[in-house]
Amino acid sequence: MQTSFHKFFLSMILAYSCCSLSGGGYAAEIMIPQGIYDGETLTVSFPYTVIGDPSGTTVFSAGELTLKNLDNSIAALPLSCFGNLLGSFTVLGRGHSLTFENIRTSTNGAALSDSANSGLFTIEGFKELSFSNCNSLLAVLPAATTNNGSQTPTTTSTPSNGTIYSKTDLLLLNNEKFSFYSNLVSGDGGAIDAKSLTVQGISKLCVFQENTAQADGGACQVVTSFSAMANEAPIAFIANVAGVRGGGIAAVQDGQQGVSSSTSTEDPVVSFSRNTAVEFDGNVARVGGGIYSYGNVAFLNNGKTLFLNNVASPVYIAAEQPTNGQASNTSDNYGDGGAIFCKNGAQAAGSNNSGSVSFDGEGVVFFSSNVAAGKGGAIYAKKLSVANCGPVQFLGNIANDGGAIYLGESGELSLSADYGDIIFDGNLKRTAKENAADVNGVTVSSQAISMGSGGKITTLRAKAGHQILFNDPIEMANGNNQPAQSSEPLKINDGEGYTGDIVFANGNSTLYQNVTIEQGRIVLREKAKLSVNSLSQTGGSLYMEAGSTLDFVTPQPPQQPPAANQLITLSNLHLSLSSLLANNAVTNPPTNPPAQDSHPAIIGSTTAGSVTISGPIFFEDLDDTAYDRYDWLGSNQKIDVLKLQLGTQPSANAPSDLTLGNEMPKYGYQGSWKLAWDPNTANNGPYTLKATWTKTGYNPGPERVASLVPNSLWGSILDIRSAHSAIQASVDGRSYCRGLWVSGVSNFFYHDRDALGQGYRYISGGYSLGANSYFGSSMFGLAFTEVFGRSKDYVVCRSNHHACIGSVYLSTKQALCGSYLFGDAFIRASYGFGNQHMKTSYTFAEESDVRWDNNCLVGEIGVGLPIVITPSKLYLNELRPFVQAEFSYADHESFTEEGDQARAFRSGHLMNLSVPVGVKFDRCSSTHPNKYSFMGAYICDAYRTISGTQTTLLSHQETWTTDAFHLARHGVIVRGSMYASLTSNIEVYGHGRYEYRDTSRGYGLSAGSKVRF
């Protein structure tokens, strides 16, 4: 194999010689061999290759090639495995694989290098490119010093950069798999060091893992731009380490020993666009744990963008480690940017975008558990923009300042929740405050965003159905370099369709800005505080929970008098009723004095600004529980709902009277509220708005009604009706003296929902068996039916039941009482006993279940007039008009649930008299022992009484009556049967029925067999 390898290099040299002599200006094309070349088994030195052609060189693969265990780190002239000195350099894979493993050298680019000053370096079309355990060590070069006129030979150490090194633009295009594992360089770019890097069209694997650079760019360093676009494979940077900047990626102007061929005056940038996924996990550097960039960092239309467990630590590598001649002020930001550090570099003329991190059109953005010893646990930048993204979350990031995000002086923040929520939660900063939480001996407090002096928020908005949730506060630095108070205000939810929520849920958020609510809501959760320069409303609403505060920012310096335009003007104020009741320790019956101090919402300051509230205020019960709490509103109450601190406003200008704007709820306790101000005029004291509640009654909500209990009586009646249908099917058919029959039965019934949302669906199935015997023209029979079923009310209740039914029936073909009008008659009676097992799945409490028994009695009588028809007419044998009467009675016993939401149910009953009138058609086959029967009838319920079920909610001692639904009085029913005699003694049959009434439908199917004797 070694022989063929040398032949390859000989042919390559000859090819270059020919190209040089021809002078035709054509790019050289060279084929590289296939095989495995292992330095541990080679008998001669590996022929390292350096090429160069001003017209460019294209190298293409002849097959799978692996180079491993090669070391020329101590050679007099250390080289890359493949190097280019002149012109563009293109490496074509042609669907093959190229692997570099355990390569060691002391020059730039242990595997591949391009030192040309112009052109492109392109690597394209490989099935797999793999670089693992490649080392570029310090190069020890000779130097000379003069000492008293004599020269003393000395050496100097120079760092080496990149497993792949390129002084020109590097393109990685359309490769299936691309991976760098555990590579190490003494300088920059543990995997790649290039002027610029473009990664595009990677289809299966693209990973940079556990690469290390002693200086910048644990995985990659560029001096103009890094771009990853249109990659189907996730782009992953995992556990890479940089001694100084950018554990994953470093985009710096002073890279490549400060001798880059780049002439650009703009800052280098980093961008990811249209990738399936981008992941930075566990990368470490002194500054910019995941990404360090002099210029902008942009994420555009990626499926997922994840930054996890990245760390910016100032002490990871000793300070004396070589830093490639970087500027000394790098240390100013040591520890900043746990995941991303975006430096506010030297801006190009006319540019104002430097230092910007942006997310636009992202599917998911997730920053979690990133750590910065300095500022910006997740992101350090001057500007941050999030727009047109799905869910965006910053969770559990930690920093000395700016738990999730730090924006420098005069920074700008733009957040727009367009297609998902933006959430900040569990982010921490170091603090010296007393009683702060302690984490591993360090006192911390929550913080989402920290902004340097002069910072401002330009956009804060959420589309309908979405929110921006600050479980951690925003803090703007105090300072004199704040935006002018006359500048454009921050417009909350500005733009069409932005009616979502901006939620401040915890801590003290400070905005040195004038704020205007355009639409949607600002929400202040319990004990959260928002301080602004001023706040007004042109639309939307302000929602406050108990203990929350809307205040003015403190003037800077503190001795400065308050600004004249520090105003809070509200026209649509909403207060959380449930939090007010909970935090005022409301009890039933009320205690005097109250069990604890009140905690109303607070607006205004005693030292600054003035407050105006106009229009009605609203009590909000978002989870619909406040009006259903016995301990809160089960009796008359008086609570503090709002404390208004008038600040510099004279006490004589009392607030105007307020009224309640919202209507009383339909469910729960019913009553009325009255609002009144309670002034404390001493020392310009606050006004307290007190609300007095007067109870008038109780109306249970849909979850408490339990309509399934009385409606189960209809289910018991339907069970017996299905048994009677099975009996009717067994009686019809060919005549016989005696017989046994068995039939499967099923029943399906649906009733539309009512105004309470209560519907009824009933499904049951079982079997019937019976015996018939004829006595002359009369037939007598007995039957037993067992049914299993389930039902639900379409709210929170569902029930399973089991019923047993006994039936007796008699039919005759003789006229009744000598009448000549009707030629046959029947009578049926059935009794059913059933057990119900109901479960109630509350949305606000644990599930409850209860059992009870139902009893049901149904009697039926009917008469008809058979009319025999000539077989040739209508293909019928018999036409039979009929009239029937059905009386039904059902009741349930009294019973009581267990648990906190227990209800007691009194017994109830239902009676119904139904009169069907219709006609039946029969046809018997003349050639086959078959029979067909069809019936259609009009139904009128002539009499009905429903007692309802008296229900008591034990915890509230409130009682109401729940009625069963009222079936429409009129309806139609159709039935059809088919019979087939298998032998002279065995007959099988099928039966179906359908009943329609306004708001309800029911149908049943059965199949059975008769044995005749």
Swiss-Prot record:
Positions of the Autotransporter domain:
733-1013
Say yes or no: keyword Transmembrane present: yes
Q: Which UniProt keywords apply?
A: Cell outer membrane, Cell wall, Membrane, Secreted, Signal, Transmembrane, Transmembrane beta strand
Q: Where is the signal peptide?
A: 1-27
Coarse class of the primary localization is secreted
As for membrane topology, the entry says:
Peripheral membrane protein
Question: What InterPro entries does the record tag this protein with?
Answer: Autotransporte_beta, Autotransporte_beta_dom_sf, Polymorphic_membr_middle, POMP_repeat
Against Gene3D superfamilies, the record matches this protein to: Autotransporter beta-domain
The protein's location, in the record's own words, is:
Secreted, Cell wall; Cell outer membrane
Taxonomically, the superkingdom here is Bacteria
- Give GO cellular component annotations, separated by semicolons: cell outer membrane; extracellular region
Q: Which NCBIfam families match?
A: POMP_repeat
Tell me which family the UniProt entry assigns to this protein. Answer: Belongs to the PMP outer membrane protein family.
Protein name according to UniProt: Probable outer membrane protein PmpG
Organism of origin = Chlamydia trachomatis serovar D (strain ATCC VR-885 / DSM 19411 / UW-3/Cx)
